[in-house]
Amino acid sequence: MKYTEKDPINYYKYIRETYENSYLAEDTTQIIIGINCSYLDSTMYSYEDIRDFIKNKNGISDFSGLFGVFAYETIHYFERINEIKSEQYYFPNFIFSDADAYLHFDKKTLSFTFHGDKSKYEDILTKCKEYEKNSKQLKKKNNKYSILTNKIKEKNNFIKIVKKAKKFIKEGDIFQVVLSTQMLISSNLDPMEFYEELSKQNPSPYMFYFPTKYGDVIGSSPEILL
């Protein structure tokens, strides 16, 4: 079936009205919507449990499997690091989703295919187009935000870790490192609206929107911003 450029996001929004536990992931060639997911996280399963689950999983498509994120603290599963920093907010060491069905969009051919039990999700697929028409009539709200992070303090901290990284590189301990800063923002902006705006301002090779009970996780490659 053919689709227009705005269809995938609208389809995803409509799907989430019925199946809230659904994610969206995209790269330069495709968009994948994982529908009606069950979740596996570190509060219920060990890392070994996840590996066993993957080995015994029967996929409904070539790209099916667990989708999720690792928190920084997951490094303790693989490396002996004594330092454990206090958390600024709670998030499990890892959380993965196992989708019951998939909607796959091919960006080159502008066609999409469904993978899963069609009889179970047929009603949603037929009503996605109607949702797209109604969404165009919605009025945009005035979005506001305020930065709560002390930007000067965060900048100074970032400079310190850059100097520390340079020292490690010179000493031969590391040859590549990913540095980052944290920013706390208060806003009335819906997370999905943020994702849509991010895709316009920073159309990166890989992006995802992953809602969880611990908070919505949005990811984007930073190459263009850099």
Predicted regions and their residues:
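Extended alpha-helical targeting/anchoring segments
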Residues: 1-226
